[in-house]
């Protein structure tokens, strides 16, 4: 029996609970709380007309609702407030509620506090989803019963009654989720850190500090996996509470997971173990070699080396990450809608040997685009731009040319809709070309999320004649 869970159920039954947001991730949470008699009020800034699907999902359940633009003004009297990950914990209304005695928490915070199984968790600016998926697949292949959650999979608190002590839980955690987390995973992985989400975080330092919460309260028996090649994550070893392990594609470090002579190798004090040759990894790109190295460092104490190699040679990749959509008349279309930052787009473009037709742009989240000038010059033959960041991406490219006294030799096309951008990209393509959607920007100007953006792109591509 999970005594912590039973005590939580007993305690929360006597509380008034507010759940902020009636989105896909919170519906299972609301259903779960109601299932053992919790008094739940669901809050959302949208109106009932815009929440038809959610209301249908919750139909017949004893849930109260507080809706509309002023929904945050009605938090008085609640004992516990579940914030949605994208909601800053220092909003004045939340601060006031806490001052009045409310406990501010989240689905993930409660899950980590109550989970009986060992938890592996991954964060970072790039590579989170692929690395998390690799850890999940590797541990599953070894025979462990595994649960996948956080930013991917399904909300896990609603399934916690079924999680056993012998299971493994693998989580992808964003900086938003980590801002208020106190309970750390026993194996924490930070893939890399670069400026990101500065439209939500007040500064780069706040973003870094949020990422550090994944390990800052670990104990001496826990493990922290760090990227030696990233200056920010490399320095976190000084704050590690338990064991720390580096992975490095670029440096020959004495211990950790390294990439030497085209092979992923695990170096320990008295042993060297070869995992796999880089060219046998099925998904392309040096960034995916790094993702495998991070996953190897996280799992090597729990699985056989050949298990890692078997996954590496067979795993096709994650949807919306350099995903081949179709080939039409010799032109390949790739969907990499997950690429919401310049660093992700740079990594994606580096996987292609020849110059590509790039579709980029989206919502501006306040990060610099200077780094894109060089990669556009080297890897792009035609640039199609859309959204608020279109002019910033073009400016980064042209500034790069000007600083080096180079001439512009690529065609730049600005578009207003995704239908237009797909049609014009197709019109510019010749046999043998690759067209890739890699926005280097978030999706929220036109879409619900990056998955929605990627699915719209795929539908438009598949409708081309």
Curated annotation (Swiss-Prot):
The keyword ATP-binding applies. InterPro entries: Mur-like_cat_sf (IPR036565), Mur_ligase_C (IPR004101), Mur_ligase_C_dom_sf (IPR036615), Mur_ligase_cen (IPR013221), MurD (IPR005762). GO terms for biological process: cell division; cell wall organization; peptidoglycan biosynthetic process; regulation of cell shape. GO terms for molecular function: ATP binding; UDP-N-acetylmuramoylalanine-D-glutamate ligase activity. Keywords: ATP-binding, Cell cycle, Cell division, Cell shape, Cell wall biogenesis/degradation, Cytoplasm, Ligase, Nucleotide-binding, Peptidoglycan synthesis. GO terms for cellular component: cytoplasm. Its EC number is 6.3.2.9. It is an enzyme of class 6 (ligase). ATP binds at residues 124-130. This is UDP-N-acetylmuramoylalanine--D-glutamate ligase. It comes from Ruminiclostridium cellulolyticum (strain ATCC 35319 / DSM 5812 / JCM 6584 / H10). The gene is murD.
């Amino acid at each position: 029996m999970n005594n912590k869970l039973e005590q939580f159920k007993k305690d929360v039954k006597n509380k008034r609970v507010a759940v902020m947001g009636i989105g896909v991730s919170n519906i299972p949470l609301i259903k779960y709380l109601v299932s053992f008699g919790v008094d739940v009020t669901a809050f959302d800034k949208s109106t009932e007309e815009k929440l038809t699907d959610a209301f249908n999902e919750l139909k017949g359940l004893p849930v109260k609702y507080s809706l509309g633009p002023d929904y945050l003004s009605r938090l008085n009297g609640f004992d516990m407030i579940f914030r949605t990950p994208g909601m800053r914990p220092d909003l004045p209304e939340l601060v006031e509620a806490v001052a009045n005695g409310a406990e501010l928490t989240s689905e993930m915070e409660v899950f980590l506090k109550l989970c009986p199984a060992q938890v592996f968790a991954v964060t970072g600016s790039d590579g989170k989803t692929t690395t998390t998926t690799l850890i999940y697949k590797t541990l599953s292949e070894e025979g462990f019963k595994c649960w996948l959650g956080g930013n991917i999979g399904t909300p896990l608190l609603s399934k916690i009654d079924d999680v056993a002590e012998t299971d493994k839980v693998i989580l992808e955690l964003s900086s938003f989720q980590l801002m208020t987390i106190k309970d750390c995973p026993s194996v924490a992985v930070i893939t890399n850190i670069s400026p990101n989400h500065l439209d939500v975080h007040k500064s780069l330092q706040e973003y870094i500090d949020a990422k550090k919460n994944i390990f800052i309260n670990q104990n001496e028996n826990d493990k922290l996996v760090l990227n030696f090649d990233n200056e920010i994550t490399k320095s976190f070893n000084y704050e590690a509470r338990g064991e720390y392990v580096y992975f490095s594609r670029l440096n020959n470090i004495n211990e950790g997971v390294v990439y030497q002579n085209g092979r992923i190798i695990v170096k320990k004090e008295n042993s060297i173990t070869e995992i796999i040759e880089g060219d046998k990894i099925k998904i392309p790109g040096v960034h995916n070699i790094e993702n495998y190295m991070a996953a190897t460092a996280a799992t090597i104490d729990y699985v056989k080396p050949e298990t890692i190699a078997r996954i590496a040679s067979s795993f096709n990749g994650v949807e919306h990450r350099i995903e081949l959509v179709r080939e039409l008349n010799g032109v390949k279309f790739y969907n990499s809608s997950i690429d919401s930052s310049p660093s992700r787009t740079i990594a994606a473009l580096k996987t292609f040997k020849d110059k590509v037709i790039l579709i980029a742009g989206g919502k501006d989240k306040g990060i610099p685009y200077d780094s894109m000038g060089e990669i556009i010059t080297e890897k792009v033959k035609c640039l199609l731009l859309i959204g608020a960041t279109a002019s910033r991406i073009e400016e980064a490219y042209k500034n790069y040319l000007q600083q080096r006294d180079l001439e512009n030799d690529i065609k730049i096309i600005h578009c207003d809709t995704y239908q237009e951008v797909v049609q014009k990209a197709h019109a510019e393509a010749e046999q043998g070309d690759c067209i890739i959607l890699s926005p280097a920007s978030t999706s929220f100007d036109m879409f619900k999320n990056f998955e929605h953006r990627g699915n719209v792109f795929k539908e438009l591509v598949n409708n081309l004649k």
